[in-house]
């Protein structure tokens, strides 16, 4: 994973954790948790691609990795929709910038996971 993506994740997570969105703070905490989970999943796929010989152990260790992959894409789509919704309803420029960057990062991560998964198939 390149260092720009790592710092982007860290920056967005830090800024999202500082936001106070009133009654929706539970939703925001859920988004933060999913962002962190997504980052870990993307990292593990990237590591598996780096050790392409690891493909067989990945498949035997987890016969349902394609199902997990599908689930992660569903989570990404949900996060994208949630971030777009937040972007539409917020008037705070700090939040708008944060959510725009989060959206961009989600789209990049989705593409990276697709690339990794095609290399593993």
From Swiss-Prot:
Tell me where the sequence motif Nuclear export signal sits in this chain.
12-21, 85-94
Q: What is its main location?
A: virion
Q: Which UniProt keywords apply?
A: Host nucleus, Host-virus interaction, Transport, Virion
* Intracellular or extracellular location(s): Virion; Host nucleus
One Pfam match, by short name? Flu_NS2
* GO annotation, biological process: exit of virus from host cell nucleus through nuclear pore
Which cellular components does GO assign to this protein?
A: host cell nucleus; virion component
Q: Which InterPro entries does the record match to this protein?
A: Flu_NS2
Q: Where is the signal peptide?
A: none
Q: Which SUPFAM superfamilies match?
A: Nonstructural protein ns2, Nep, M1-binding domain
The protein's superkingdom reads Viruses
- Transport keyword on record: yes
Q: Which HAMAP family does UniProt cross-reference here?
A: INFV_NEP
What family is this?
Belongs to the influenza viruses NEP family.
- State the remark under miscellaneous: Average number present in a viral particle is estimated to be 130-200 molecules.
Subunit structure and binding partners: Interacts with protein M1. May interact with host nucleoporin RAB/HRB and exportin XPO1/CRM1.
Q: What does this protein do?
A: Mediates the nuclear export of encapsidated genomic RNAs (ribonucleoproteins, RNPs). Acts as an adapter between viral RNPs complexes and the nuclear export machinery of the cell. Possesses no intrinsic RNA-binding activity, but includes a C-terminal M1-binding domain. This domain is believed to allow recognition of RNPs bound to the protein M1.
Name of the protein: Nuclear export protein
Q: What is the lineage of its organism?
A: Viruses, Riboviria, Orthornavirae, Negarnaviricota, Polyploviricotina
